[in-house]
Amino acid sequence: MAELPQSRINERNITSEMRESFLDYAMSVIVSRALPDVRDGLKPVHRRILYGLNEQGMTPDKPYKKSARIVGDVMGKYHPHGDSSIYEAMVRMAQDFSYRYPLVDGQGNFGSMDGDGAAAMRYTEARMTKITLELLRDINKDTIDFIDNYDGNEREPSVLPARFPNLLVNGAAGIAVGMATNIPPHNLTEVIDGVLSLSKNPDITINELMEDIQGPDFPTAGLVLGKSGIRRAYETGRGSIQMRSRAEIEERGGGRQRIVVTEIPFQVNKARMIEKIAELVRDKKIDGITDLRDETSLRTGVRVVIDVRKDANASVILNNLYKQTPLQTSFGVNMIALVNSRPKLINLKEALIHYLEHQKTVVRRRTEYNLKKARDRAHILEGLRIALDHIDEIITTIRESDTDKIAMASLQERFKLTERQAQAILDMRLRRLTGLERDKIESEYNELLEYIKELEEILADEEVLLQLVRDELTEIKERFGDERRTEIQLGGLEDLEDEDLIPEEQIVITLSHNNYIKRLPVSTYRSQNRGGRGIQGMNTLDEDFVSQLVTMSTHDHVLFFTNKGRVYKLKGYEVPELSRQSKGIPIINAIELENDETISTMIAVKDLESEEDYLVFATKQGIVKRSSLSNFSRINKNGKIAINFKEDDELIAVRLTTGNEDILIGTAHASLIRFSESTLRPLGRTAAGVKGISLREGDTVVGLDVADSESEDEVLVVTENGYGKRTPVSEYRLSNRGGKGIKTATITERNGNIVCITTVTGEEDLMVVTNAGVIIRLDVHDISQNGRAAQGVRLMKLGDGQFVSTVAKVNEEDDNEENADEAQQSTTTETADVEEVVDDQTPGNAIHTEGDAEMESVESPENDDRIDIRQDFMDRVNEDIESASDNEEDSDE
């Protein structure tokens, strides 16, 4: 290999060379390639393309020209970095889904939202759009500086005049070395309004600017969730903006629904989005979608249709799609731009300030340019006026001169003209000597004097110049402004919570004696007449039965209070949904109970942070406590202490109150006390309580409930042998806390001890559960209303060894679909979906309910009617006796 001359070899330390070369490369990428200028919002390649279009005269009123010609001209003169980078940049400026206000008017295939590439440059054509002219307007009036191109043979603009704030209007994106920029597009009208507000009030705050500029306005429309991310980005230059597709749930007949997506987030590839949805359906990560198709067309615009299965919840599916697909995504704002050729992170106000200063400079330089031209023209017109006033002498002087140089010198000397004026006279045509031409020159001269005066006023007064900037921006806003496309949903959301992905529905949560828990839809249990046999609520294990149930929404909290005075918390949807006959799962799989700990009460709560609600506790030994509900808002997985009491005591029940109610405590031996809740001072979460009722020997508390002081509610009493009654609350007078209470029922061997004392309004249904797991749902109106001393009427027929274990209230629901199912069952002999009941004689065997003559004959309803008539007579006798015994019981208190 031939040796190079010594003069061409420079020895350098490789570390220094690498450091300096990389810095040079990094600065070249930052300043000359990847970042936009804060003044015109353009990177060098975009600026060179637009200037090249302007130089070729490819204005909107001219025919399209081949893209290859444009690319070749730009590459040869200004941008020697390959044709692909130039063409790709030009294609993006022509895409109405990439630019809010496209700067290139393309003809041919310029790509699609599905990620399809544009046709080759030899097939497509392009020219400028009308709004692009505003970026280049006045470029030839010395409004901006020109610099040498890469080889020094051409001149190119260092920045465009940019008569509208393109940096914010169309946004920008670029990756440099060690930094990147990502600026969202905005609405032209809003941004110009922001510039106008800033020009009138330099001390304006970003919050005030946001009254004009609501937020990004993406070309693909869609939704922006909340303003917190927008405000953070505008204040600091960095932030995350949540974008969401616009989707509607439509009915498509037959009770079926479809999800129709008509707008998608900015920069989302529609085809890949659809592929992602299909992938999730295929992998069974999203259930309930039966069909997925893209119906997008030029006529309808974006339209992606998702058919939903009849039994699926379209809202839940849509929320799952938001969470797991690009139907919802974020836009990371990073407002870095070149300020004085240096990269800088700017906020919204700074971006507008730099643009406004640029416009003031452009208008000032244009005014100076126009003033210079006007003065030059006025100077020429002054010479022409002199010539017209002395036309004969001028002609004589010219005729006497041998050459044009002598003539020019003679005119300058004799009429005191400048060289330019003398040249203009020599160049003047003879037709200018007519009277009409003389008037035109005079008129033009006077107009020029006025124009010069106006230009001088603009340069002399900053406010006049600023007003001119405002007027020109307003004119652009009126010409090109349009309505906002992207809707900003105030209040917004950040991340989708679990509740958003789970349908909200009314459920029943049941808990068995052996602590097995499950949930079922509340519609599983249909309402029956009093005395019915009920439906099988679960297949219980030996010596196990349903002990508690509560109705709530899947989105509500359920608090579990244990016999040891501890509290645990779950969401409704966190309890597994199982079949009606399923025994459930062990409660210890859901919450971490301690040894020998059982659930005393389950309470459904919507808002645990409420400061206006309270919890009232009652123990087996008659102790009560009131505590604010907000004390229980932070319950961890291991639970917390809810109440402290003695070792021989245990928690019986807990009730949710408003703080202004009356407390009712009932015992197994039919004593009931009513006192005002206000007599209970609110205590802390771990505090012990005070005496609520004085118990007779062998008696224990079995029920706790609350009622309004002027309540028209009724006290419902249910005994262990399936009897019950309703008694108005008003029959239980208010007394002092700690008394023995008054009689609430007559206890006999026939009806047994009381297992439930609660209040009802008459608008509820009643769930009565036996130790065998049989559940019956009754309308409260079907239960007779009796006095305090009555035994009650039969609510439920019990088999041998069966007794009522628990009772719960269920709100009535007008379920047309359920009623329709019942009607269908009454007219068909057999259906796979019919509900089943349990025969007392053969527990667990399924038979049909209403209208079964065989069952009626077995149970001898005539005998039951005679028993009920006799019982009603005895109840009336007991009511007469009761009034006589009240005074005696009052004295016991």
Curated annotation (Swiss-Prot):
UniProt entry keywords in alphabetical sequence: ATP-binding, Cytoplasm, DNA-binding, Isomerase, Nucleotide-binding, Topoisomerase
Annotated Basic and acidic residues bias: 863-879
Domain of life: Bacteria
UniProt keyword S-adenosyl-L-methionine present: no
Enzyme Commission designation: 5.6.2.2
CDD domains xref list: TOP4c
Enzyme class (EC, first level): isomerase
Active site: 123 (o-(5'-phospho-dna)-tyrosine intermediate)
Domain Topo IIA-type catalytic: residue ranges: 35-501
A cellular component annotation (GO) from this entry: chromosome
Primary location class: cytoplasm
Molecular function (Gene Ontology), one example: ATP binding
Keyword Cytoplasm: yes
Catalytic activity: ATP-dependent breakage, passage and rejoining of double-stranded DNA
InterPro entries found in the cross-reference section: GyrA, GyrA/parC_rep, Gyrase/topoIV_suA_C, Topo_IIA-like_dom_sf, Topo_IIA_A/C_ab, Topo_IIA_A_a_sf, Topo_IIA_dom_A, Type_II_DNA_Topoisomerases
Motif residue range(s): GyrA-box: 528-534
Any Gene Ontology biological process: DNA-templated DNA replication
Biased composition (Acidic residues): 812-821, 852-862, 880-893
Protein's cellular compartments: Cytoplasm
Stretch list, region Disordered: 810-893
Miscellaneous comment in the UniProt entry for this protein: Few gyrases are as efficient as E.coli at forming negative supercoils. Not all organisms have 2 type II topoisomerases; in organisms with a single type II topoisomerase this enzyme also has to decatenate newly replicated chromosomes.
Functional summary from the UniProt entry: A type II topoisomerase that negatively supercoils closed circular double-stranded (ds) DNA in an ATP-dependent manner to modulate DNA topology and maintain chromosomes in an underwound state. Negative supercoiling favors strand separation, and DNA replication, transcription, recombination and repair, all of which involve strand separation. Also able to catalyze the interconversion of other topological isomers of dsDNA rings, including catenanes and knotted rings. Type II topoisomerases break and join 2 DNA strands simultaneously in an ATP-dependent manner.
Similarity comment text for this entry: Belongs to the type II topoisomerase GyrA/ParC subunit family.
Known partners and oligomeric status: Heterotetramer, composed of two GyrA and two GyrB chains. In the heterotetramer, GyrA contains the active site tyrosine that forms a transient covalent intermediate with DNA, while GyrB binds cofactors and catalyzes ATP hydrolysis.
Protein name in UniProt: DNA gyrase subunit A
UniProt source species: Staphylococcus epidermidis (strain ATCC 35984 / DSM 28319 / BCRC 17069 / CCUG 31568 / BM 3577 / RP62A)
